[in-house]
């Protein structure tokens, strides 16, 4: 079970070595921008490296939106991100589920997701990540994810489970792993994060493991059950300890 972290994109290989990470995740551009990622001078080096590198797509992406000024740029930047991810030999691109205007629009949001995936041209796997809050979200609650998966599950899309997000959404972690696997057939990646807030808060505020509201042993049980590569999206100070903690617990 590979354990690593979300690191600065400046030098992912050096960051991985410094943190003892066996796998990393990076942004390829500004996560709050519609601008396409710039070509990387080290693309060939990253592609040749043995280190698995995951890419997180920009936060602005909302493939479910009925608003053309949001949905169309979302499709475009996802394609551009996948193209840039292919250039570095990325293991996958992770994207949030987005949301619609009201619950009556959920089914239409599912179909917009389907259309976006059908139009996407990439050999890089794309993983849907569950989200912490937001009204009328595509991927906040596992029941909604199941409905979405009925529409997009045969496209080859994968799933990334974020423990902080599941906690914030009020979902049970270990039982939630079983529920998600029953829907998707597998979990492809885990974002193992503690939460600064109470269960069901809807707030997406990560904490280092043991410094938040989630019992560290519960996190260990969840990632063990998920049986997938692990990325800690926690604060840089303490992240090396997060990796070491998980490695000790999961290898014992």
UniProtKB/Swiss-Prot annotation:
SMART domains registered for this protein in UniProt: AP2Ec (SM00518)
Catalytic activity as recorded in UniProt: Endonucleolytic cleavage to 5'-phosphooligonucleotide end-products
Enzyme class: hydrolase
InterPro entries: AP_endonuc_2 (IPR001719), AP_endonuc_F2_Zn_BS (IPR018246), Xyl_isomerase-like_sf (IPR036237), Xyl_isomerase-like_TIM-brl (IPR013022)
One BP term from GO: base-excision repair
Entries under Pfam families matching the protein: AP_endonuc_2
Entry keyword set: DNA damage, DNA repair, Endonuclease, Hydrolase, Metal-binding, Nuclease, Zinc
EC number: 3.1.21.2
Residues noted as binding Zn(2+) 3 in the record, renumbered to the chain: 165, 204, 206
Sequence positions that bind Zn(2+) 2: 129, 162, 191, 233
Residues annotated to bind Zn(2+) 1: 56, 96, 129
Annotated protein name in UniProt: Probable endonuclease 4
Protein's organism: Mycobacterium marinum (strain ATCC BAA-535 / M)
């Amino acid at each position: 079970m590979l354990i690593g972290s979300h690191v600065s994109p400046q030098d992912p290989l050096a960051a991985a070595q410094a943190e003892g990470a066996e796998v990393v995740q990076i942004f390829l551009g500004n996560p709050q921008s519609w601008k396409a990622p710039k070509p990387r001078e080290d693309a060939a080096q990253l592609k040749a490296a043995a280190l698995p590198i995951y890419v997180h797509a920009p936060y602005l992406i909302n493939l479910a939106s009925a608003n053309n000024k949001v949905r169309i740029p979302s499709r475009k930047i996802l394609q551009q991100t996948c193209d840039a991810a292919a250039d570095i030999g990325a293991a996958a691109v992770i994207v949030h589920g987005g949301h619609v205007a009201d619950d009556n629009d959920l089914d239409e949001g599912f179909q917009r997701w389907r259309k976006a995936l059908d139009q996407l041209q990439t050999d890089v796997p794309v993983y849907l990540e569950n989200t912490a809050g937001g009204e009328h979200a595509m991927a906040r609650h596992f029941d909604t994810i199941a409905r979405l998966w009925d529409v997009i599950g045969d496209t080859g899309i994968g799933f990334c489970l974020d423990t902080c997000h599941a906690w914030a959404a009020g979902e049970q972690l270990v039982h939630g792993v079983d529920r998600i696997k029953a829907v998707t057939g597998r979990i492809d990646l885990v974002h193992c994060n503690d939460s600064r807030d109470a269960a069901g808060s809807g707030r997406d505020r990560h904490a280092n493991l043991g410094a938040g509201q989630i019992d560290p042993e519960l996190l260990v049980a969840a990632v063990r059950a998920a049986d997938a590569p692990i990325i800690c999206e926690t604060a840089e100070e303490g992240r090396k300890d997060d990796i070491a903690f998980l490695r000790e617990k999961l290898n014992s």
